[in-house]
Amino acid sequence: MTILTTLIKEDNHFQDLNQVFGQANTLVTGLSPSAKVTMIAEKYAQSNQQLLLITNNLYQADKLETDLLQFIDAEELYKYPVQDIMTEEFSTQSPQLMSERIRTLTALAQGKKGLFIVPLNGLKKWLTSVEMWQNHQMTLRVGEDIDVDQFLNKLVNMGYKRESVVSHIGEFSLRGGIIDIFPLIGEPIRIELFDTEIDSIRDFDVETQRSKDNIEEVDITTASDYIITEEVIRHLKEELKTAYENTRPKIDKSVRNDLKETYESFKLFESTYFDHQILRRLVAFMYETPSTIIDYFQKDAIIAVDEFNRIKETEESLTVESDSFISNIIESGNGFIGQSFIKYDDFETLIEGYPVTYFSLFATTMPIKLNHIIKFSCKPVQQFYGQYDIMRSEFQRYVNQNYHIVVLVETETKVERMQAMLSEMHIPSITKLHRSMSSGQAVIIEGSLSEGFELPDMGLVVITERELFKSKQKKQRKRTKAISNAEKIKSYQDLNVGDYIVHVHHGVGRYLGVETLEVGQTHRDYIKLQYKGTDQLFVPVDQMDQVQKYVASEDKTPKLNKLGGSEWKKTKAKVQQSVEDIAEELIDLYKEREMAEGYQYGEDTAEQTTFELDFPYELTPDQAKSIDEIKDDMQKSRPMDRLLCGDVGYGKTEVAVRAAFKAVMEGKQVAFLVPTTILAQQHYETLIERMQDFPVEIQLMSRFRTPKEIKQTKEGLKTGFVDIVVGTHKLLSKDIQYKDLGLLIVDEEQRFGVRHKERIKTLKHNVDVLTLTATPIPRTLHMSMLGVRDLSVIETPPENRFPVQTYVLEQNMSFIKEALERELSRDGQVFYLYNKVQSIYEKREQLQMLMPDANIAVAHGQMTERDLEETMLSFINNEYDILVTTTIIETGVDVPNANTLIIEDADRFGLSQLYQLRGRVGRSSRIGYAYFLHPANKVLTETAEDRLQAIKEFTELGSGFKIAMRDLNIRGAGNLLGKQQHGFIDTVGFDLYSQMLEEAVNEKRGIKEPESEVPEVEVDLNLDAYLPTEYIANEQAKIEIYKKLRKTETFDQIIDIKDELIDRFNDYPVEVARLLDIVEIKVHALHSGITLIKDKGKIIDIHLSVKATENIDGEVLFKATQPLGRTMKVGVQNNAMTITLTKQNQWLDSLKFLVKCIEESMRISDEA
């Protein structure tokens, strides 16, 4: 974008602006948003000061940030994102927004140069003083001494939570001399202490818990945007007492008890344990001298104000909202007089003393004495939308007027295409920058702005893809912390006490923890399991691979099995029969498909390439991979049968559209079958829009078409005039004949009835089939289906999808009103989820009284199909502002303009339901909001409370996500394999079911499990060899280490585990050293064919297999074991060698030496 800033800074008009920009009370008028951003960016580039850009709300701040990223390095651009909503302080915070705020405050506190975008709400928000913030930014260096208690206290003050194992942002842990911290900014950090000295600092991976690189020093930023010290708590308690005493007599007697409870709950907090999320509500009472963000800026900072009058309007409504919000919480006994979240001074008072430049599109009256006024003439650019003639005449006008023409396109390929297009129009253009660019020609560069603009006085026009092709601007990637799926779904296999488990031989039990037992004078760790009645089972940790976590549908509570009964055997046999049947069915289908002859497509045509380049967004890697897999299938002679699986809004439709276009380009017809009329309409519109520039005839068959139109479409399919038909089950009627059907695309097949599914099966015959589903297919199942069903998975969301901001709140009409007003004020729409059909119309009336000007519709499952579809269609077409609905919206409907979801009684929903419902919003490039409301003061059932707790962790991270994924995976498995399988999955648990299915499929395909070259080794030694609780306190970590030891087969793996133990838990005690010795002995035994090593008191028995006996070189063995002398004796039993070792001092070392010698005495068989 250098060319643009070069052209601007050389112009006299900009130079006039530059002279007064940064002087007090300057007004700049006439600039469109993108033109304004270009000027502000150039001013910033030329100055050495901090620049503060104030907007009226966060939405505007986001838009300006996207454009500014084109000109300013992401490292120097900061945003202070505060929602335009009071309830934010009353709900679970989004870690993403919090980390952006912390990054901004830290940069300001360090006096860094930068361009800082702050919405009005952020400007007024109460904050910790800058001095306190600076005192709580820590830099740690190797070799420094720290006071550990003081350091840990400071972390708590900064908003960190102490956990036994660090797995989420904002946590820390202490194990021995190791401190782990996961800051909001940067990598997780591991600090190893030698007494009080920092011995080393390493970053580590939360997924593996292993250290990565050593670092010399690290900055630890806060985990909250408030600092809360003991002093702050003391001051807070005093202020709170006064506020309570002041409020109590002034409120209604009926709520005084509620106020007392609110006060008591806050009074309990001590600095050693408090929740920043809750205390932030009391920010007005925390600090003797609270600050705002303006106090963090340098005294010579420059301020730019975007649309002063709009800011004043927002300020007015913000004050009214804040007053009404605080009044409501006081009146309901949930708040105190004097409580507030923002500074009430006028925004002009806040920025007094700084030089302010005001930007306004129109010349306007302002209550400010202006020193300078700079007027620009700026015009919007004609919208061409691919219309060649209009484009050519407009470009010709620019050339004739000697304009500098800057064309911005988003990829290198598009630069070449654009140049070719301009060349056809005889418009001179260049793509490489020269020292100076002559006017009267176009320069085409990679870049993007939200809109184009024309500055006639400067002789400059900037044209973007939005005007050229109606493309939306791609949002720039910004340095937000990437949250990997692995981190989100850390592992639903984590075993917690009380979890249900499945033992391969004994069935479903309950996990009670790891216990160290003394058996025969030695200590060992066992997994303790509870079965039916008082039955208990202790499983040695070295047999833990027989125990899996029981994973089934969310609402499924399994029945415990009885130990020693036949019930479990019967259950397993039933499931075994079922998986064998399904495996056979899958194999038969697969063989049938392999034998079938389909149409073999050629390589992509030139039209295909052009069509794909017209897609206005970057494909995600998963989309690109799925498209390649589908094209590979189409280019084979056997018919395709592929399942494309991806979350709602992850871009499955574009993948399907490309496959459809490929089929049409080779003269084939495409049928696109969808479960509902509305989806048919939406897919039809997408196809029309995507293929408008190509000779493709697309028709729709649904209730929205007249009988005459349907008759014409049927005729067109028969004659071949229609290339693509989109439709509901109407497409399945027997009187429809295709001239040459080549591709059938089925969306959400599981939503069709049995009769329709049968008809789909007949349609599939010898035709390529692509099935789309939004329900995730679990990876384990994916693996067991390899070679039987072709699956493509899209797991990554498109780049410009913002994470949905999720709030968990008590039900309160003022919260609801605020959320509704905020969405409608940005011309958006709202889903209001109310799942009681009998009183849904009363709920609509209640909301209508709250929002008299809003158009409110109702949708529920008891309406006729026609009424429901018409209501939904009106909502999609923006005829209603709010849709009060039941869970009927859970699947399928795409309403890009609806970006707020409010769910009443969220505690009654399953997590997977909430996850899917939340996917309804945040579908466009706007931020989506989801409010999960639960009744105030309601006594929740234990399950609802657990669920609510999980929902509270349902922001970007947290276990709520894991549980939702787990339940959806099981639903996905049911959809893939048939509903009756769902029941079988629930009886034996998901993992065991997947394992049984995989074995059955492999057996039917004749693939034998590779038998281990070396048999299983049993090592039984009378030694205290285990992981003591004093060394590893966290049971999950303990189980994880035992699992790794159980799977160890090489010495490299042993070294790796030793490193991990020292890395994560510090130096290990003698019990752990012995455990590692036993694993080392086992590895030698594995490699040398030893089957048993048993401690018999005074001697140790060692048994070799017959095969190992044949392979051993006796001479080499006897020579190598001479140092053992007479303590070792050799014999033969049933053609297999046995060795006894008499125990003496250091017998464990002797045993290690002996098994190593046995391994080294093995003859290597000639395979070459």
UniProtKB/Swiss-Prot annotation:
Major subcellular location class: cytoplasm
Listed GO biological process terms: regulation of DNA-templated transcription; transcription-coupled nucleotide-excision repair, DNA damage recognition
Enzyme class name: hydrolase
Domain Helicase C-terminal: 808-969
Domain named Helicase ATP-binding: residues: 633-794
Matches recorded under PROSITE patterns: HELICASE_ATP_BIND_1, HELICASE_CTER
EC numbers for this chain: 3.6.4.-
Localisation: Cytoplasm
Transmembrane segments: none
Residues reported to bind ATP: 646-653
Keyword set, alphabetical order: ATP-binding, Cytoplasm, DNA damage, DNA repair, DNA-binding, Helicase, Hydrolase, Nucleotide-binding
PANTHER family named among the record's database cross-references: ATP-DEPENDENT DNA HELICASE HOMOLOG RECG, CHLOROPLASTIC
Family indicated by similarity: In the N-terminal section; belongs to the UvrB family. In the C-terminal section; belongs to the helicase family. RecG subfamily.
Official protein name in the record: Transcription-repair-coupling factor
